Each structure stands twice: as C-alpha cells, then as structure tokens.
C-alpha cells in the first residue's frame, strides 16, 4: 500500500476516487479525475517547503540503491567483503553494464522491511563498508571502469565498535583515495546525504542530487537540538543549513540537479531510474572527452570552502 505524507492527503483522496471509478468502469469520471490529479500534483509539488522536501528524501517508498541497481544495471555481479574484517550490508558493490557500458556501482542501502533494515543497519555503514567501497574503487581503477556511486544514508554508524575499528580513518581514507582515482567517477545523492557517511562515496568528477534529496553535515533535528536546544526547531534549522539541491547548487557544492517525475521518485521509480541512467551516461561522455578530468577534479575539490577576506 502506498504511503502518503500529510501534505499529499488531497492526492490520496483523488487517487482513491480514481480507483473507485475504475471499479465502476466509469471511464469519463476516471479521465476527469486524472486531469484533476495532475493539476493537484503540480500545485503541491511546485510549492514545497524545505521541510516537505526533507520528508520526501526520507519517504519510505522512495527508491533505494538496490531498486535503481536492479533497474539500470545489467549482467550484474555483486562483490562482498572488505578483505580486512567483514562484509557490511549497508554498502553494496556491483560490477555490471549500463547500456552495454561496463561499470562499477557502489551504493548505500537502507533496506525494506524490519529484517532487511536490520541486516542493512538502516543504511548506516561501518568502517568495513567504506573499506569495501574503496576496494571496489581500486578494482575499477585497475580495470579502467567508470564508477557510479549512489548515496543514501542518515550518516555513518556511530556505534562504539565502529569507532574502535576506525570509522573516521576509513572515511578520511576514502576522501583521499577517491580524489585521486584515475577513472571517471559520478556520484548521485538519491535520498539522504548525511554528513561524512555520505561524503565517503561522494568525492567524484560529477556530484549530482535528485530533486528531492538532501545533503547536510548533520541531521536537521540534531542541528536544532545543538544550536537551539530544541528539536522542534527543525524547520528553522533546515533553512539555516541550506541542505536542498537548489541551495547547494547555488553555493557551488554540487554540479547538477536531476529532476524527478512529477509525483516524485517514490511514485515512479522506473522513470527516476531512467533519468539517473541517462545522467550517468551523459556525464560519463563529458568526462571521457576531457583529457584533463583528473586536474579538473582536483581543482574542484580544492576550491571547496575557499573564501576571500578583504581588508578595510
């Protein structure tokens, strides 16, 4: 059963009416209701608040990494383990083909259903997950394969065991190594881009965000609790943090925004998957045509956080 957010109640009501019209076999009513539905969707989704966009980024029906991998990656083979400690199910790694282009795909997977969510640790990777991702990146470099990374995590796992096994070192190592990979790298934030847990697989030649995704240094609730000592100030925190694709594109922190289907990726995962596939192929062609893409990647990364201080 589809899940509707509070601001989608009118959409739910019209959708229910359409289903009743189908049961009655009333094609005329169905056609009228579908036009009304399209109008309502455009009205709601063209006036979303930043808080509502956060809700969409976390929507339980939103496609996860495995959904996209199943839809766009052919002849795929999953690779497990980090060769050091364990296999982290929160990060998935595949070799396969996207439109006959051999690729390596690395994704953060939250899981569906109680058992699978627990297996995936709710998409919060441990150090072995990031080392597993780095192992696959080095594999891609060895065999000259482009890399597609799908980012979707609330953050790296903050447990004691993760810290004891070097969580911060694993993330820092990925930042260093991914910055110097000699193959094209493309990263797409498909849902939540939470802090260093997201950044560990977001250092790339092209960094894009889905239209209703977020990218932040801390959760808005955490920010509200720390700065305002009040978790209910989440909406205030969201505006201050500027975590939406539009804000981050204006700040020069991401390269592109991938538009979603009119009702959001959670209502049409097939169209959403196709747009990611087309973006990847277009971005890959652009990178491959640039003989200086490694230098350009380095310059882009070095420019982040730079500022000019004037003396009065």
UniProtKB/Swiss-Prot annotation:
GO molecular function: acetyl-CoA carboxylase activity; ATP binding; carboxyl- or carbamoyltransferase activity
UniProt-listed Gene3D superfamilies: 2-enoyl-CoA Hydratase, Chain A, domain 1 (3.90.226.10)
Subcellular location: Cytoplasm
Primary location: cytoplasm
CoA carboxyltransferase C-terminal domain boundaries: 36-286
InterPro entries the UniProt entry points to: Acetyl_CoA_COase_a_su, ClpP/crotonase-like_dom_sf, COA_CT_C
Pathway of action: Lipid metabolism; malonyl-CoA biosynthesis; malonyl-CoA from acetyl-CoA: step 1/1
Coiled coil: none
Keyword annotations: ATP-binding, Cytoplasm, Fatty acid biosynthesis, Fatty acid metabolism, Lipid biosynthesis, Lipid metabolism, Nucleotide-binding, Transferase
Assigned GO CC terms: acetyl-CoA carboxylase complex
GO term, biological process aspect, one: fatty acid biosynthetic process
Its EC number(s): 2.1.3.15
Reactions this protein catalyses: N(6)-carboxybiotinyl-L-lysyl-[protein] + acetyl-CoA = N(6)-biotinyl-L-lysyl-[protein] + malonyl-CoA
Enzyme kind, highest EC tier: transferase
HAMAP family listed in its UniProt record: AcetylCoA_CT_alpha
Subunit note: Acetyl-CoA carboxylase is a heterohexamer composed of biotin carboxyl carrier protein (AccB), biotin carboxylase (AccC) and two subunits each of ACCase subunit alpha (AccA) and ACCase subunit beta (AccD).
Family per similarity comment: Belongs to the AccA family.
Function (record text): Component of the acetyl coenzyme A carboxylase (ACC) complex. First, biotin carboxylase catalyzes the carboxylation of biotin on its carrier protein (BCCP) and then the CO(2) group is transferred by the carboxyltransferase to acetyl-CoA to form malonyl-CoA.
Record-given protein name: Acetyl-coenzyme A carboxylase carboxyl transferase subunit alpha
Record organism: Helicobacter pylori (strain ATCC 700392 / 26695) (Campylobacter pylori)
Organism ancestry: Bacteria, Pseudomonadati, Campylobacterota, Epsilonproteobacteria, Campylobacterales
Gene of this entry: accA
